[in-house]
Curated annotation (Swiss-Prot):
PROSITE patterns, per database record: COMPLEX1_49K
Known function: NDH-1 shuttles electrons from NADH, via FMN and iron-sulfur (Fe-S) centers, to quinones in the respiratory chain. The immediate electron acceptor for the enzyme in this species is believed to be ubiquinone. Couples the redox reaction to proton translocation (for every two electrons transferred, four hydrogen ions are translocated across the cytoplasmic membrane), and thus conserves the redox energy in a proton gradient.
Protein's recorded name: NADH-quinone oxidoreductase subunit D
Catalyzed reaction equations: a quinone + NADH + 5 H(+)(in) = a quinol + NAD(+) + 4 H(+)(out)
GO-annotated cellular components: plasma membrane
Annotated organism of origin: Rickettsia rickettsii (strain Iowa)
Lineage, opening ranks: Bacteria, Pseudomonadati, Pseudomonadota, Alphaproteobacteria, Rickettsiales
Top-rank taxon: Bacteria
EC id: 7.1.1.-
Length: 391
C-alpha cells in the first residue's frame, strides 16, 4: 500500500504577533499536524558581543539592557558580577540588597508580561490588561532609581549608580502588599479554567532527561520537575541570606511551566519583603577610587577630582588580565557572561549565554505531533525574546 500523503510547508512569521519578536518558523505540516518546526533566527542580530570589545567596561553596561529588554536589570547583574570577579572588588552590603531587590522586581516584570501575553495568544484578553497595570507600577520604580522605564543602566561593577530615593522602599512595600490579591484574581481566571487547561495540559511535554540534554534552565527546567536554581545552588550577592522555595512542576507541559512562573512571583514577593526588612544603611558603591567617580561636591572644590572624573568616563578603568564566567538566575533561565581580559580598559572577549537560545532549539521536538494552534502555545511558554537570542 503506497503512502500518498503530501506535506505542506508553512511560513509562520517573522511578522506574526504570536512569534514574540522576529521569529521565522518554517513548519512542515501533514494537514493540521506539525511534523517538523524549523526556527530561523538572526533577524535581530546587532553584533552586541563584538561591539562590547570596542567599549570600556562602563560603556558596555547599556548593551545588556537591550538583550532581554523585558528583564534588563538581571542582565546588568551578570555583567557587574563578572567584572567584579576580575577586579576582586568588594560590593557594599546595601548595594547587594538593592541589586537583589531589583532583580526580583525584574522577575515579576518578566513573568507578568509572559503570562499576560501567553493568555492573549490563547484567546484570553483580561489577564494581560490586569497584569499590565501591575507592570506599570514596577516600571515607575525603575524610573525612580534610574530615570528610565526600560533601559535602566543602573547596576555598576562595585555597586549601583545611585541610592534609593526617599520613600521608594515604602512604595515598594505597598506594592507587594496589594500585588498577591491581583495574582489570586489571575489564578481564579486561569488555573481551573476548562478551556485554559485544554490548551495547555499535555502540550509541549519535556521530560527531565530532554530538559537536561537540551540545556534548558529556569522555568523550562523546573517545569519538568528539576529543582535547579542558581540563587540556591550558586548564590550571589545576598541570596544566601534569603528564605524562599524553588517551585517545580510534575509533567513538564505548558501548564506546568505557566504555573511555575506564577508561583515564582509569590517567592519573589517574599524575597523583596526580606530585602526591605533587612536593608542596611551605608554606601551603595565601592570606595575604590579607580572604579567610583568623585562626588559632584568634590568636583566643585578640587581640580584633581574633576580630572579623575573625566578620565574615568573617557578612558575607563583597567581590569587585570584573566577570565571568568558568572551566571545569574534571570527570569528566563541561566544568563551567563564569560569575560576574557588581557589587561587594559576594554574586554578582549565577552561571550553571552542566553537561556532563550537553548529553549528555542527545543521547539522542534516539542511541537511534533501537535496542531498548529498548539505551536503558538508552546512558543508562549518558552518565553523567548529575540534581543538575547540574536544578540
Amino acid at each position: 500500500m503506497t503512502n500518498n500523503t503530501k506535506t505542506i510547508t508553512l511560513n509562520l512569521g517573522p511578522q506574526h504577533p504570536a512569534t514574540h519578536g522576529v521569529l521565522r518558523l518554517i513548519l512542515e505540516m501533514d494537514g493540521e499536524v506539525v511534523n517538523n518546526a524549523d526556527p530561523h533566527i538572526g533577524l535581530l542580530h546587532r553584533g552586541t558581543e563584538k561591539l562590547i570589545e570596542h567599549k570600556t567596561y562602563l560603556q558596555a553596561i547599556p548593551y545588556f539592557d537591550r538583550l532581554d529588554y523585558v528583564s534588563p536589570m538581571c542582565q546588568e547583574h551578570a555583567f557587574a558580577l563578572a567584572v567584579e570577579s576580575l577586579l576582586e572588588c568588594e560590593v557594599p552590603r546595601r548595594a547587594q540588597f538593592i541589586r537583589v531587590l531589583f532583580s526580583e522586581l525584574t522577575r515579576i516584570l518578566n513573568h507578568t508580561l509572559n503570562i499576560g501575553s501567553q493568555a492573549l495568544d490563547i484567546g484570553a484578553t483580561t489577564p494581560l490588561l490586569w497584569l499590565f497595570e501591575e507592570r506599570e507600577k514596577i516600571m515607575e520604580f525603575y524610573e525612580h532609581v534610574s530615570g528610565s522605564r526600560m533601559h535602566s543602566n543602573y547596576f555598576r561593577p562595585g555597586g549601583v549608580v545611585a541610592d534609593l530615593p526617599e520613600g521608594l522602599l515604602e512604595d515598594i512595600d505597598k506594592f507587594i502588599e496589594q500585588f498577591p490579591p491581583k495574582l489570586h484574581d489571575i489564578e481564579s481566571l486561569l488555573n481551573e479554567n476548562r478551556l485554559w487547561k485544554q490548551r495547555l495540559v499535555d502540550i509541549g511535554v519535556v521530560s527531565q532527561k530532554e530538559a537536561m540534554d537540551w540545556g534548558f534552565s529556569g522555568p523550562m527546567l523546573r517545569g519538568s520537575g528539576i529543582a535547579w536554581d542558581l540563587r540556591k545552588s550558586n548564590p550571589y550577592d545576598v541570596y544566601d541570606e534569603m528564605d524562599f522555595k524553588v517551585p517545580i512542576g510534575k509533567n513538564g507541559d505548558c501548564y506546568d511551566r505557566y504555573f511555575v512562573r506564577m508561583l515564582e512571583m509569590y517567592e519573589s514577593i517574599k524575597i523583596i519583603k526580606q530585602c526591605i526588612e533587612k536593608m542596611p544603611k551605608g554606601a551603595i558603591k565601592t570606595d575604590d577610587p579607580k572604579l567610583t567617580p568623585p562626588t559632584r561636591a568634590k568636583m566643585k572644590e578640587s581640580m584633581e577630582a574633576m580630572i579623575h572624573h573625566f578620565k574615568l568616563y573617557t578612558e575607563g578603568y583597567d581590569v587585570p588580565a584573566g577570565e571568568t564566567y558568572k551566571a545569574v538566575e534571570a527570569p528566563k533561565g541561566e544568563f551567563g557572561v564569560y569575560l576574557y581580559s588581557r589587561g587594559g580598559n576594554r574586554p578582549y572577549r565577552c561571550r553571552i549565554k542566553a537561556p532563550g537560545f537553548a529553549h528555542l532549539q527545543g521547539l522542534d521536538f516539542m511541537s511534533q505531533g501537535h496542531l498548529m494552534a498548539d505551536v503558538i502555545t508552546i512558543i508562549a511558554t518558552l518565553d523567548i525574546v529575540f534581543g538575547e537570542i540574536d544578540r
